[in-house]
Amino acid sequence: MKIYQFPTFRVETQLFHSPGAGYDGGLTSGGAQFITPEPGGFSMLEIAPALIDTEWDAPLASWIMSKISGQVFRVRLAPSPQIAFSRQRGMVAVPWSNGQAWSNQENWDGDFTAVYAAAALKGAITMSFDLTGVGPIVLPGHVVGHGSETYLVDEISYVGNVGTAIVTPPLRRNIAVGDNCYLRPWFTGRINNGADIRSAYDNMGHVKPGNIVLQEAVV
């Protein structure tokens, strides 16, 4: 299966969330609940791009708009409040301290990579990771990653710098001791709202695509 690398561009908003295993419907007077094929639910990533003024130089917006027929993307999450980064560590190494533009999404403290401190099996909802070097900065509401999957931290407790977290959705693959734990993770998914993205396209070179909604692809 071909997996495309999602391009890096400025974003106004980004939100990773896991809607859950079921949702209510109105098929009967008492309502109905539909269960997704993924036990424990699935995850989604919503991105609101900022204005893109480089379309004539690199037509990435139109390229994304053409990939709405089930193509799979690997997306690096942009810096956001869901990324545990330098706000917890002091404003020391962030790009704006040396005049660089922070919007390039590079060189953030959130790029720190921890290691997993315990093995965990696919389908589990608990993981342990060692944050030696940055300290216990990951809190409920932050995201962490393993491989090309992202997980939302629901609960976490610490013994020193080792955190044990309950996460959603359940683990998509086995974790081994020493595997990388990404504080700025990757997400693998498919775009499911192509018409919304295309509606704002024009040929003037100043493009602000509509919100991009990616639904998790388990590959």
How would you name each of these model-derived features?
Residues 1-219:
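Extracellular/virion structural assembly segments
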